[in-house]
Amino acid sequence: MDQFKLTDDLYIKLNARGKVLSPFENFKADLIGFVKNDPTFEFKKNYNGFDLNHYDIIANKFDNTWSDLFWKETKKHLDDKESKNKYSVDSYFFRFLHRLIINDYIIGYTGSEINKDDIYKELLKKESELHYTNFDLYASKKLISSKFIKNLETLLDVYSKINEEIQQHLNPLWDKPAFKYSIYKVENYTMDDRMVFEAINLFILNSGIHSDNHSEIHLDIQKLKEWMRIVWNLISDPDIRSIEANKAVMTVIREIAIHSNDIYNNLV
């Protein structure tokens, strides 16, 4: 262990063949540990015909249906041998989780210059470099909570069920047909991408879908298209160039998202 400079935590987290786990696998192990220690997820639910603790259901989804979602993205890049790490299932999963965390952090930030904030910079580094050492940052700064896990479960359940249907209706109306926005974008991820990602997720979370009815998932696609039209108009303002301006728009999007499933009839 000393020879390879492994920490105690990383040394313990080896699979049966002695292979060091990936950053995401370590993160997932700690995240599931967090869920198991949260009494919110102790109660039993029916899952595929079995009565299981909620935390066991979440752990199962991580390894199966949710991983299948990101595998569909990975398959699109199987020929790119040089960049296989950034297009792996683990990498897509890791980025997705951190983009949720980063958006929450941006909106909740109360300082004056977030670009200089150490936590923000560390989260960006983790997102881009797929870097993970331990769970301390997420726990001590309350970056992950019971609410975060519940929202994560809803989002990933929805994307796992109707991902393609959602992806087909996210583009701004004025863009060329060849342009295709994707929530799984890897390269050149911008603040516009963060704002759109936030808006899509808020539409899902305000749709009335919750953890007890994920087997019957349905979104009103026409209402999604209407919502995305409003969102693209908001974020396309050329004056929105600083992260402070981005945060202001993200805050507005979060405030009006309670009406996102019928935005036209709720605009005053």
List the model feature ranges, each with a label.
Residues 1-268:
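Flexible coil/loop and intrinsically disordered segments
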